[in-house]
């Protein structure tokens, strides 16, 4: 009779131990996923900042060009930032965001930047009155806005994924604590 009572108790202990092992394994997987997401998130704030810098600096450049003040250094600066945003090169420590929407917007913006530079050359040679520089500058500003918003959306998506993993990890740990309490209470009987 005693052996039969011990067996179900031992069986319950084994089941609880197996469940605990699974929960610990799941927790390890959650931590790995969270570390991956945090790595993806690192550097996005800098990308958002520099994407915004491109927007503002381009407007400044156009204003300077319209008033007859050439600024080839600013053009080079903008070229370098756009290259860093697209290819993760240069000396601004920019990361490449692996997000299709952002990359598509950045590609369109970069292509339009090349057209805008051609228009700047036209301003330099014939004055801004004979060009479409103001309208092109406005179009470029909106493109840059869309690129910044896409980078912000990417960052927000990752933050939501990290928050979800955090909540699932907390739930996993709560289950582990409950099982430990059950084991402790069972051992005290």
Name each region found by the language model:
Residues 64-122:
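Extracytoplasmic ligand-binding sensor domains of the Cache superfamily
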Residues 153-189:
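Selective recognition of signaling/oligomerization transmembrane alpha-helices
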Residues 37-76:
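Juxtamembrane membrane-water interface segments immediately C-terminal to a transmembrane helix
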Residues 10-38, 171-180:
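Extreme N-terminal signal-anchor transmembrane helix of membrane signaling/transducer proteins, especially
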């Amino acid at each position: 009779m005693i052996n039969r009572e011990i067996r179900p108790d031992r069986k319950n202990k084994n089941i609880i131990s197996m469940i605990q092992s699974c929960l610990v394994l799941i927790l390890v997987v959650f931590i790995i996923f969270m570390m991956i997401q945090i790595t993806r998130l690192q550097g996005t704030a800098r990308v958002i900042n520099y994407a915004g810098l491109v927007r503002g600096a381009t407007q400044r450049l156009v204003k300077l060009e319209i008033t007859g003040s050439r600024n080839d250094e600013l053009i080079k600066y903008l070229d370098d930032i756009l290259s860093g945003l697209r290819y993760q090169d240069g000396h601004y420590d920019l990361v490449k965001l692996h997000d299709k929407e952002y990359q598509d917007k950045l590609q369109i913006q970069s292509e339009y930047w090349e057209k805008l530079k051609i228009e700047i050359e036209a301003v330099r040679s014939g004055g801004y009155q004979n060009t479409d520089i103001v309208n092109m500058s406005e179009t470029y500003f909106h493109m840059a806005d869309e690129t910044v918003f896409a980078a912000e959306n990417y960052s927000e998506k990752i933050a939501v994924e990290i928050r979800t993993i955090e909540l699932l990890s907390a739930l996993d740990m709560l289950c582990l604590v409950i099982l430990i309490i059950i084991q402790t209470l069972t051992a005290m009987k």
